[in-house]
Amino acid sequence: MTKWFDTNYHFIVPEWSADTEFKVNAKNLLAQIKEAKAQGYDIKPTLVGPVTLAWLGKKKDGINCRVKDLLLPKLLPAYAQLLRELAAEGADWVQIDEPILAAEAGSAWLDAFAPVYQELSGTGVRILVGTYFASVAEHLDLLKSLPVQGLHIDCVRAPEQLAVFAEGWPKDRVLSVGLIDGRNVWRANLSKAIATLEPVKAKLGENLWIAPSCSLLHSPQDLAVEEKLDGEIKSWMAFAAQKLVELGVVKRALEQGKDAVQAELAASDAAAADRATNKLIHNDAVKARVAALPKGADQRKSPFA
């Protein structure tokens, strides 16, 4: 097992050998989609992308060439079949996550994106490429060249990239902006999020989507079931269910104006102001001691010490 990028979550590392083959078994996924549709939800299945999947694996004995050259030709027919099955089940959009784009994977892996997504582009679904955990602004030209209909960017970890994509991303394609932190337990500053997105909304209109920065699997499920938390601390928190509510507030503000969510914004502002100064987490004596430390006292001699 190893960590999923820089998170505290782990995954079982796949091992690739020369005789590795791939077959699609979408029974469980399709059952979940049918269940969601039966409850009236619009669906957007999310998959780990083929380039990221191949890159994350470990090469075993018997592979004498580059992993991507061996694996991707085998992976792509399976991905294409899965996308066609999702389309047949009524999926209009499918999110394909490629966090490799935010890692230092090297040019050989980046060169794989164009042929991979060219092959996946005719499968009957609209594709949203998902990125997270770091900026992908340096790959703007590559991402624009892909035959996909949308892109998700993490603007919590890399807020500076929003300006790059707001200006450079094609206006006829979806830009999904992750401004609600999917990796923590704290309420968002909704007034700040709305102010950040208003000029982007003016440029992109309906092609602006708002989203968590990454999957909400990194957050606990629902704050409402927590009965033993300190009341003050609980008032600063938002778990996955509450973060979805926050997204709804931002959406309404962008579509109907801030007056439509005045009460929600007032509550958000009050929580942010309280957390910024509350004595439960702000100790002036500790701050003074830290400020008095000699220069360099908070740094290790070796980054791995």
What would you call each of these model-derived segments?
Residues 1-305:
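Domain-level signal for soluble alpha/beta catalytic cores
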